[in-house]
Amino acid sequence: MSGRTEGGAAERDHNPVAQLLPRFLLVLALTPLPTPAFAHASDRGHVLLLPTGYYVAGGALAVAASFLVLALLPSDFLDRFWQRRLPLFAFGDGARTIVSLLSFAGFAILIAAGLFGSRDPLSNPLPLTIWTLLWVGLVLLQGLFGNLWSWLNPWYGPWRVVSRLFGEREIKRLPAWLGYWPAFVLFLAFAWFELIDPAPDDPARLAWAAGLYWLLSFAAMLVFGYLDWSRGGEFLTVFFTMVARFAVIERNEDGRLSFCWPGAKLINAAPLSLSGTAFLLLALSSVSFDGLSKTFFWFGLFGINPLEFPGRTAVVGIGTFGLVLMFVLLAAAFILAIVLGQRLAGSKHSLGQAAGLLVWSIVPIALAYHVAHYLAALLVDGQYAVAALSDPFALGWNLFGTADMQIEAGVVAGADSAWWLWNVQAGVIIAGHMLAVLVAHGLAWRLHPVPARAALSQFPLTVLMIAYTVFGLWLLATPAAG
């Protein structure tokens, strides 16, 4: 959450867009070069020199080594690896409606707190819950334990109640060609609001945005049906469902739970349409741009001194262009890697089929970026959220006994904290890319049963993953503001 609110009113006269593209491409070309950089802790207020060049080189080599090892393994070995399950127990859906109704009630209270509670984003539970507990904490839990959002989302329970009270009405069908495009557009709007809007932390502003989104989504579910709109229109459900495929908990159609390897559920996923592929790439590019947009390098492109940041209002145009450009460049690089891989393997599969299947390997990378990028915010702002929930309307309440808790911001401040935080973040980034290579190989064998062709098809995509590993570590290490 930190760093989203407007930081000043001074405006500057720049013409940044004309200068941006060549310089932006330059940084993507230069980031693979391992050079000393500055590591940062929460909000990057503390920087110290660390041998990050060794981490960058080591991360790139680890991802490359993963590809080489997998290329030499027999296909049946990995097939047995992915299919292993440890059965647990059955878990029914009986309480799902009640849990969703409780979630909706909590959401309504948060909206009221946003409108009538404290104006301080670190004291009001609405921005802390949405930007920290939901967008960071729940994404992490979803990636570890599976689709918790299907129970926690605030639409399912109210939809069931309305359907029961007024009966099942005839619903309109969404055109098949729409696919995930509604969710893509809404996710792009969400990313713009989070990263570009001058004050997404403002409680009242966020309350109006979140409340309006809930109403529009609920209306769409009544018109087009809960399942159809959830699968292709409601971006949070689409995103959380995709992330849940990486989890180590699997639930079959009979409701039985079992342990599986991380990413195992991605191997059997159906190919995504063009819109689904675009959605996953947007999920990765948006969090990547969030990191890039705060770097000294980014500000330097436009002659902005990061120590005299003019405020988010002054960089709305720059940010909007950068958000879109980041998606376009990532999508172009991904498609190019798929095209080259298909040609190397002599594949007869269409580009859409290959890209729609292999894009599932982006999920571990997107999840790793999300966790690594927002880890410091989760550790600090999560404490503020726990405190704020005890007194949602700033009336002096202490509902859970946490209103007066001491916030331990030192957990991410200082040289020692910067060292361990950098190591955890770097480890998450590297592990995410290594798992992505593993998943990509499993998916490639579905396209190319011949092991040699499967390995050849993955070479360009692995090069892209190595480059993105370096880029991700550079983002974590380079000096940044905000």
Where are these regions (language model features)?
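C-terminal structural cap/anchor segments
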Residues: H349-L421
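Transmembrane-helix bundle segments that line or gate the permeation/cavity pathway
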Residues: A39, Y55-C260, F289
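Membrane-interface segments at the starts/ends of alpha-helical transmembrane spans
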Residues: S42-G58, D120-W131, L266-I267, I304-F321, ...
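Juxtamembrane boundary at the C-terminal end of a transmembrane helix
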Residues: G472-G482
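Long, contiguous internal "core" modules enriched in hydrophobic/ aromatic residues
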Residues: R164-A366, A376-L379, Q383
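Hydrophobic alpha-helical transmembrane segments
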Residues: G179-Y180, V315-L330, G401-G432
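N-terminal secretory/membrane targeting signals
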Residues: N15-A39
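Interfacial loop-to-transmembrane junctions
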Residues: A440-L464
